[in-house]
């Protein structure tokens, strides 16, 4: 089984095997678009990575599909094993995505329908979701706002303040997602790193974006190592 490593400093992907045999290491540092025809010849346009920060690899209809969070180039690059690009996911246009917000992807996962979920730096409304054809589907799995004393007090004041006073109030926003993963059943997991927050630190979400852990009553989190874990009918020590 192959292991894919992101070399952020050198802008490349390193592919190795479980044995880490140096003779079998592959490097992906140049990626090519489809042929662009001119009157005289076929020209292959190429591109490179700029501070990549995450990768997701899946298999679909016999092909190995590689999705790379190309952080500084503000895109998710999707390609085959030979480096041929079949899709670029870039900053969405339209009213749903703030034009003043950057598009710096940190990590990505892809479900069985090839929908793409992207963790973006400074986005607090959840992960950015794309369909397989590159269409922007909106946001998925936003964290809830931490119910602090200030937030609760602001809810009270909003009931009696004028519209002008409310506009001047400090906005309560959720914390951005730190990382994401997906299991073989299609459930998406997110973690949120914030020393002052306990809300939605760890989530397991269904296709609707609902946190199943909360529904099961797991509102309290225990930190540290577990001696055993129960998962899918089995106990792992």
Question: Where does each model-flagged region fall?
Answer:
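Eukaryotic scaffold repeat domains enriched in small/polar residues
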Residues: 1-237
